[in-house]
């Protein structure tokens, strides 16, 4: 496996665990990072810096996926390769960053890798 799959969430560890369990995603992710401990929330740029520091990688080595346009925009402006997961065929909000790619679901991501 040449990629690490990491959740970076404003949610608590308990909430993230419940969502992972409920959606049968157990064992899919290599790591779960919650902002619960640092008390700084997305879209603050310090949040996006957490995985950079933890994994010692360059911003451009990081593909960031979100279904939230504000999150995609903030991550892209931070310097990540931001991908929009557009499950419902929505229109991307008029924000100052557009995603590098749009996918329908995480299966599409697997096909890209």
Sequence positions of predicted segments:
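Catalytic-core regions built around general acid/base machinery
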Residues: 1-2
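Asp-based, Mg2+/Mn2+-dependent phosphohydrolase catalytic module
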Residues: 8-13, 17-113
